[in-house]
Amino acid sequence: MLSKIERLILANQYKILKILENTSEYDEIIKILEEGYEIFYDEILGHIFDELPESEGQFVLDILSFYDIVVEPYKQKNPNDHEIINHPYSYFKGFDGNSETKYMAFVRFLIEDQKKFSFVAKYAKKTDNFNSHFPMLDKYRKMVELWESKYNKKYDLKREEILDILNA
């Protein structure tokens, strides 16, 4: 999994931390890296996630934009439109924390760290911090594909057009 060069660089980084912090807590990690005990690499690198490809990041931005710029403003302007307001997909539910973790983490980064998508952010509590607890990827893909192909990603959609996308 790690080349000898990568192991050497990481081991040296931990040796520097050991000196700076004047602690022996890094000795085990240094030994794992120097000896090449691959079975324990996940303990060292477990908090480093796989990359989210640009296309997947754009997909997440698209679905959040749909809710933030299309659905939420419509709901604010039309508070008596109960069909849309009560529609099961009238708000962004998030992604499944078990099977769609990288998407959920990216949403949290965008909303919590970058402070983007303010209309969507208000649903954090309602959605268990954007953990839908069930797969949403296919549903969102259908919605984004319809929004792109049929409506050219317009922001000023009519009621029927919004419902069409929510029902995708």
UniProtKB/Swiss-Prot annotation:
Transmembrane segments: none annotated. It comes from the Archaea. The keyword Cytoplasm does not apply. Coiled coil: none annotated. Keywords: Plasmid. Pfam families: YfbU. The keyword Iron does not apply. Belongs to the UPF0304 family. This is UPF0304 protein MJECS11.
